């Protein structure tokens, strides 16, 4: 009988340690994801450390050639539409307005890539000043204190619960780690995709009222993608400060408590470990919608 009790005790302890180890692997994945995020969160997409910008620049030049023709076309369309009544609308003041708009549009196309680089550098510097390491996930000793006070068959149920809890918690943390890295990397991809279309979009400003909506939509989209990383940095900063000093459930494992109470407390500790990860990931993945609603950038 003592042999069975010893076997049950060791088996339950092994399951608990396995759950703790698996949860620790999830925490290690989160830490690794945090290092990757810290490396790229303040990177300027136009810097040489990120591949693809040379291709984007070449495509911008190619689309600029198309935009020159479109600028002339939109200018003529806008002129004709706003000068139907020649006697009333065809004035010197309107002519100056048309040509000033045409010149500004042309300059925006020519120097647009430089302006884009300057804006991205500004946002990179701003983000670098805000960025902070992500909240850590630790599973050290999360299951100890309960199993040490149990023997025999009573170790099986909490051991199994701890194993399942560790696996589920690690899976949640792993998925969140992948999502938070994708949120940072997808921003670079979206910026690289829309930058070459800037000349074509900006050329619509030459047409004036009724035609410049395309250019306005491009600017709003670009600013949304650009400022998204600032919201991500703020979310990481706030989550680290908030969850780093707050105990959500106030759980405490003690030998004076029954194994049932301790088991519930340990499971709550797992939830307390996973909750900051979920909250941080939700804030990061929703950064784009937050910045669009905050600044009215919805197209």
Residue ranges and their predicted role:
Residues 59-66, 102-106, 178, 185, ...:
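Loop-to-transmembrane-helix entry motif
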Residues 202-220, 290-297:
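Alpha-helical transmembrane segments
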Residues 64-77, 168, 173:
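Hydrophobic alpha-helical transmembrane segments
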Residues 1-70:
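Binding/recognition "hotspot" determinant
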Residues 15, 19, 26-29, 33, ...:
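Non-cytosolic segments of integral membrane proteins
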Residues 7-19, 91-108, 215-228:
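Alpha-helical transmembrane segments and their helix-start/interface "positive-inside/aromatic belt" motifs
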Residues 70-104, 197-212:
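Hydrophobic transmembrane alpha-helix segments characteristic of membrane transport
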Residues 6, 50-61, 86-98, 158, ...:
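Membrane-helix interfacial "entry" motifs
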């Amino acid at each position: 009988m003592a042999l069975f009790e010893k076997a049950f005790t060791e088996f339950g302890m092994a399951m608990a340690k396995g759950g703790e180890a698996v949860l620790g692997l999830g925490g290690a994945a989160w830490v690794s994801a945090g290092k990757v995020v810290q490396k790229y969160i303040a990177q300027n997409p136009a810097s040489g450390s990120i591949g693809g910008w040379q291709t984007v620049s070449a495509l911008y030049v190619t689309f600029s050639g198309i935009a020159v023709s479109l600028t002339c076309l939109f200018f003529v369309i806008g002129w004709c539409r706003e000068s139907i009544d020649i006697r009333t609308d065809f004035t010197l003041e309107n002519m100056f307005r048309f040509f000033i708009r045409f010149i500004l549009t042309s300059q925006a196309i020519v120097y647009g890539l430089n302006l884009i680089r300057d804006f991205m550098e500004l946002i990179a510097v701003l983000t670098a000043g805000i960025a902070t390491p992500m909240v850590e996930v630790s599973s050290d000793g999360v299951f100890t204190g309960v199993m040490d006070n149990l023997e025999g068959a009573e170790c099986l149920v909490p051991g199994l619960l701890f194993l399942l809890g560790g696996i589920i918690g690690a899976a949640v943390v792993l998925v969140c780690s992948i999502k938070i890295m994708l949120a940072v990397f997808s921003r670079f991809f979206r910026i690289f995709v829309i930058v070459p279309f800037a000349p074509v979009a900006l050329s619509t400003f030459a047409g004036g009222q009724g035609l410049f909506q395309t250019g306005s939509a491009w600017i709003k989209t670009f600013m949304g993608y650009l400022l998204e990383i600032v919201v991500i940095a703020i979310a990481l900063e706030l989550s680290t400060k908030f969850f780093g000093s707050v105990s959500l459930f106030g759980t405490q494992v003690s030998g004076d408590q029954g194994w049932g109470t301790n088991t519930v407390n340990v499971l709550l500790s797992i939830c307390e470990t996973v909750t900051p990860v979920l909250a941080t990931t939700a804030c990061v993945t929703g950064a784009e919608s937050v910045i669009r609603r905050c600044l009215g950038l919805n197209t």
